[in-house]
């Protein structure tokens, strides 16, 4: 693989995906008992999410990702970029004022959260006030 001929992380990922056995493990949870995802599973999930994201954004729109370190984070990150969006990942440990600043500064077209606990951290912030 000639990395210097690739233009993005998305191209690098899909090139690597084409080169490896699709059944080879790729992502797994740190918690016991959670599933492991192979290269084929991840590729399919990226394409499905990317297709949905493409219906919600225009090329170059920012897409915020609020998630813990988990397999779905990488899937969301690559899906956003594959859809033409700009991925804006944020930590789950920020203070409310940090979330408020980032939301207003980046003005995301969509926000992807990993679970309801993460959504609760931001859904009450002024950014979501449709009357302003």
Model-derived regions, located:
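A short N-terminal helical cap/helix-turn-helix that marks the beginning
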Residues: 2-26, 44
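Hydrophobic residues at beta-strand termini and immediately following loops
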Residues: 37, 90, 130
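Conserved AMP-binding/adenylate-forming core of the ANL superfamily
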Residues: 26-57, 61-70, 74, 78, ...
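Anion (oxyanion) recognition and catalysis
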Residues: 81
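Structured binding elements
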Residues: 84
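ANL superfamily adenylate-forming
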Residues: 31, 116-132
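Conserved ATP-dependent adenylate/AMP-binding module captured primarily in the ANL superfamily
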Residues: 92-123
């Amino acid at each position: 693989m000639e990395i210097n001929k690739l233009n993005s992380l998305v191209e690098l990922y899909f090139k690597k995906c084409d080169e490896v056995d699709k059944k080879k493990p790729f992502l797994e949870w740190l918690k016991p008992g959670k599933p492991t995802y192979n290269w084929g599973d991840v590729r399919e999930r990226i394409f499905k999410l990317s297709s949905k994201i493409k219906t919600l954004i225009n090329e170059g729109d920012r897409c915020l990702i609020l998630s813990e370190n988990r397999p779905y984070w990488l899937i969301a990150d690559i899906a956003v970029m594959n859809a033409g969006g700009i991925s804006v990942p944020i930590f789950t440990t920020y203070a409310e004022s940090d979330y408020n600043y980032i939301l207003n500064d980046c003005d995301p077209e969509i926000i992807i959260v990993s679970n309801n606990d993460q959504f609760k951290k931001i859904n009450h912030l002024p950014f979501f006030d449709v009357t302003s």
